Amino acid sequence: MEPIPNDLILEIFSRLPAKSVIGFRTLSKHWASILRSPVFTELFLTRSSNRPRLLFAAERNGEWLFFSSPQPQNRYEKSSHLDYHTKFSGDVSRFICSYVSGLLCFPDLWLSKDASPVICNPTTGMYESLPDLMRYKNARGFLGFDPIGKQFKVLSEAYPFSDQREHHEILTLGTEELSWRSNIISCPAYDRSLSEGICINGVLYYLAQTLGVPSCVIICFDVRSEEFKYFDAGCFNDQLDDTSGLILVNYEGKLSGINWKYGQAGERRTVELRMWVLEDAEKHEWVKYVYTLPENEVLDSCDFSVAGVTTRGDIVLCMKYTCKPFYVFYFNPERNTLQSVEIQDFGANLEAVENCGRVYAFVNHVEDLRVNKGKQLKSSISQVKHLCSCCNKVSQPDYHYQKA
């Protein structure tokens, strides 16, 4: 019998879920060498990028549950199915996770007795506990990716317990021994960070407040060269007192900031989106756009947050808490259209107020196999059927991978 050509093997396996690929890697050294090769890793990422998903992280009573759902492919979709991935127990002390290319970074997650930075692939159930940074306890952490060197890096800021605020710590994932190192190029000193980070084309951006007279600036960290820059973002100064509703996003390849507020049109409550787009990166020119969303009875009456912007240019709004029914809204600024998509089975067992969980959503989620190391979360390999806390169906374990 003729052996199967490697090209055909790569093509077949590139269409499988990431968790199944990881399971097949354990069958033999031959399979492992093929499925860990850079050629396959890039092919798998390309396939996954062509079918982006919306990733949900639901936190409830110290337990994290991860789901994903396909992003709409047309303007007429009204509902979408939900895929359950994995869960683990862990409390976040202060800052929520950041997301880059399929990975989540929790700066201070209590998985055991102590809190430590944790990198997690919610789709595959792989995670890695990073060395603790005692002197930077409760500092915000950011995850970035260098598309040229194909490296993920974690940036931990010096704030708030360092006298040398300009010195941050950097860790490169995928190395034999994970260790933090001080950056050689000093970061411009600032009082505190004000937002989560967004990585665009190898540059990590986050909003910060200056020392002295309070003003907003954007801190830029080049993930490859590890150089810092900053530029003025005074357009956000009116939100210094409360930046919780502000999110930095990638809008058609440009750094942008979005927040929202409620308005009133007669007796109806309206939702107004405000978006600042960095139209000229060299001159640091921001252009402001204001949109009043089309009337939607559900959106006008629920708590929601901005999740990001899809590759099609839709601004995604997600309900903040688990409930039934659970909706995601896609607003297209160019067409001034609002698409409501019900995520089926989400929150079916959490109707009671006391059981509601906080939901965080991340757009354009892809399955990425570029970080191979880590431990498998127990819930991903359990041979016991477990009831997903956020839906009415029993989730089946992945029997293809049972190696702890």
From Swiss-Prot:
Top-rank taxon, per record: Eukaryota
InterPro entries: F-box-assoc_dom_typ3, F-box-assoc_interact_dom, F-box-like_dom_sf, F-box_dom
PROSITE patterns from the UniProt entry: FBOX
SMART domains in alphabetical order: FBOX (SM00256)
Cross-referenced Pfam families: F-box (PF00646), FBA_3 (PF08268)
Domain F-box, chain residue ranges per copy: 1-47
Name recorded for this polypeptide: F-box protein At3g57590
Species of the source: Arabidopsis thaliana
